[in-house]
């Protein structure tokens, strides 16, 4: 079962959390999160594609809850693996690499104590999950300008056009230089907000 789900929308000061009920049933938690996730065009997670979303789909099916919507995802594990050669691609390591505190320490005993209805353990579990969300947010925005291989154009998705940064959706951009490709001359841009460089997919006429 899912003990808690911690989440955070961009612009919030701190995460929020959903917790299983007093009977350790996660059906209400799942139904609430399905409504929440349906509000956003993009979901960001660390190993979210292979773990978090699959676990939630399995639990919604087992609980006959409302199924998760089909969402666009950005997975920081895939992003770092596809764009960088690092010593480790774990969230804790990437967080510490950029000078943050990393994940909270925990062990298997915490899960045992939570299942025994230990309130102090449950509080620690929620703090652990919320800390993960904060580290994920910091790692994602720090790493984004250095990831040329993204599954989507963020600006086009959020603003509805490509005249913006594909990494942070900012329109605060300047021309950098032109690039000659096999299919024609293309403009390279530089984002003044996140620092990203990219080449326009459209040919210069």
Give names to the regions the model predicted.
Residues 158-162, 185-186:
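Flanking scaffold residues of small Cys/His-coordinated metal-binding clusters
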Residues 44, 91-159:
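Acidic, Mg2+-coordinating catalytic module of metal-dependent nucleases/exonucleases
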Residues 169-189:
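Short recognition patches in nucleic-acid-associated and regulatory proteins
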Residues 1-11:
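Acidic, metal-ligating active-site segments
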Residues 192-205:
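Short metal-binding segments enriched for Cys and/or His
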Residues 66-71, 100-109, 175:
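Short, surface-exposed acidic
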Residues 11-93:
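Conserved DEDDh/DEDDy metal-dependent 3′-5′ exonuclease domain
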Residues 163-168, 191-194:
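Short cysteine-rich clusters marking metal-coordination/redox-active sites
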């Amino acid at each position: 079962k899912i003990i808690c789900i911690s989440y955070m929308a961009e612009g919030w000061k701190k995460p929020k959390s959903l917790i299983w009920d007093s009977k350790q049933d996660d059906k209400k938690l799942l139904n609430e999160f399905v409504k929440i996730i349906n509000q956003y065009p993009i979901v960001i997670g660390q190993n979210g594609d292979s773990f978090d979303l699959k676990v939630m789909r399995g639990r919604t099916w087992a609980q006959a809850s409302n199924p998760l919507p089909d969402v666009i995802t950005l997975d920081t594990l895939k992003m770092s693996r596809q764009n960088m050669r690092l010593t480790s691609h774990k969230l804790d390591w990437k967080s510490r690499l950029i000078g943050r505190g990393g994940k909270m320490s925990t062990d298997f005993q915490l899960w045992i104590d939570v299942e025994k209805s230990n309130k102090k353990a449950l509080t620690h579990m929620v703090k652990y999950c919320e800390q993960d969300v904060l580290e994920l947010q910091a790692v994602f925005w720090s790493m984004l300008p250095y990831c040329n291989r993204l599954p989507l154009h963020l600006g086009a998705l959020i603003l509805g056009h490509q005249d913006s940064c594909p990494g942070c959706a900012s329109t605060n951009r300047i021309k950098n230089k032109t690039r000659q490709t096999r299919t024609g001359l293309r403009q390279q841009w530089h984002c003044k907000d996140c620092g990203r460089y990219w080449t326009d997919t459209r040919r210069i006429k």
